[in-house]
Amino acid sequence: FCCPFIRYCCW
């Protein structure tokens, strides 16, 4: 999952 508007937020 990656946040749509935050860059380094994938896990």
Swiss-Prot record:
GO cellular component labels: extracellular region
Expression sites (tissue/organ): Expressed by the venom duct.
One MF term in the entry's GO annotations: toxin activity
Keyword Repeat appears in the UniProt entry: no
The keyword Cytoplasm is annotated on this UniProt entry: no
Cellular location(s): Secreted
Keyword annotations from UniProtKB, A to Z: Disulfide bond, Neurotoxin, Secreted, Toxin
Pfam families associated with the record: Toxin_26 (PF08097)
Cysteine-cysteine disulfides: 2-9, 3-10
Taxonomy, superkingdom: Eukaryota
Entry domain remark: The cysteine framework is V (CC-CC).
Main function: Causes dorsal fins drooping in fish. No effect is observed when injected into mice.
Family statement drawn from the similarity comment of this UniProt entry: Belongs to the conotoxin T superfamily.
Name listed for the protein in its UniProt record: Conotoxin au5a
